[in-house]
Amino acid sequence: ETIIPEAAISNWYDYYRCNGLNLPAIGWQGDDLDILAKYCFSRAKDPEDYASVREAYAAWLEGIAADEDRDSGNYSRWWDMRNYLKAADRFKASVFLVHGLADWNVKPTHCVNLFAAMESRGIPCKMMLHQGGHIYIHDLQGSRFNEMLHLWLDHWLYGIENGAAERIPNVLVQSNLDQDLWLASPSFPAVKGYTEPVLMPAQASGRLVDDLSATVYDRTRDNAAEWLAELVLSERHAHCLRYITAPLETDTRISGTVQVSFRAACRASTAILSAMLVELGEECRLTPEQEVVQAGGIPWGNNTPLGDWKRFRLEEKPSAF
């Protein structure tokens, strides 16, 4: 009757690839679908059972490794069969989506694309976007997630006419400025007006060099934060181009997915181009890391351990971006 995808994948190609590039989840370099299939194969935990399927399972894994075509990274019929968005017309259940805007494992596009597919087909659907990463939010203080979930399940599983469709907003987005504030809208993006920012190049040249050695990145130590700070804050470097807007005079909310269009010529046979949107300015920002604020504050029911209420941690010192 209903499904509740939390940090869920809607297109397996988009999880492991990006426009022909191998792009696994952050922290999982080298991962691919055959490795995940092996990792999740619970029958290997039972030696007697596993022995009965070992050869067939090994052949099946070899087939996945060949079909995923890691060498080319191309989208294929095999990947197309694992794109749930292509099967949206066959969805029958209502959907309650939950995803973290800072999820670098399963990126938020998986959630947003599935919501759009459901919405366009008139399938009852809700979407809740929080400021965390690849997590569950049943213990996120102030989210009221458990209350809404009970309301939703009572309606769809028990047929109770409790006004769940009207009482739960179609879209809830947690503010990155105040984690107790959830912005509600009937759809996504929340359209209340649009102003296109004017981009001003921080340097005149439109040429860049794809050369990691030109950066401060050091393979021998963990200095990713230093590399990112140089990339964002340094005004001129050969390996990147920066474009900045005029200072924002009023509070501005970006709703939806930012799109970047450009034309580029490349002197090499291959190259990696990426873009990111950055907020500049000294501020103590919300982080995706969580901290316990009330130990044992969640009673789950009789004879069950108490849960801890958590919140997202605020930076102790202002950051530049």
Label every PLM stretch briefly:
Residues 118-135:
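Catalytic histidine neighborhood in serine/cysteine hydrolases
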Residues 104-110:
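Conserved alpha/beta-hydrolase "acid-adjacent" motif
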Residues 2, 92-95, 122-126:
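Loop/turn elements at helix/coil->beta-strand transitions in domains of secreted/extracellular proteins
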